[in-house]
Amino acid sequence: MRKNACCFTGHREIPPEDREPLRAALLSEIQRLYAEKGVTEFYTGGARGFDTMAAEAVLKIREALPVRLHLILPCKGQSDRWHFAEKRRYREILKQADTAEFLFERYTPDCMLRRDDTMVARSGYCVCYLRDPAAKRGGTAYTVRRAKKEGLEVIHLIPVEVEQLTTL
């Protein structure tokens, strides 16, 4: 666990009314983590939705502050089935990231969870967008539970009691 590092986890689908407030919250939280906690390393998994928003927020903040964006990607070809606009954003983020690491050559049944585990292992903080704290399934719920178990400070961009989350 690294105290100067933070990972992001959140849903792929974000309701339209949440998008702008979420972008603002991400920018604010990244700046706060840098100023108050000395966080300079930010990890995202490169998925659609929240991961993309988080990566773009780090890149925006990087224009003014010495922060770095690291992509931990589950497999090559992750974006193959995405829509054209999503693929374009993904490629742009890949080009601008400080590092990009593919964990597997091709998709495996557990590659997404291994990506999540890797980000948690490299971080001291986890910023999340989790709409249902009682969720027992899904990558976001899994990653938040894992982060809590590993002792990371979990920061919810939607107020949720971490204790409400079920154990791994």
Task: State the predicted function of each range.
Residues 1-168:
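Acidic/glycine-enriched connector segments
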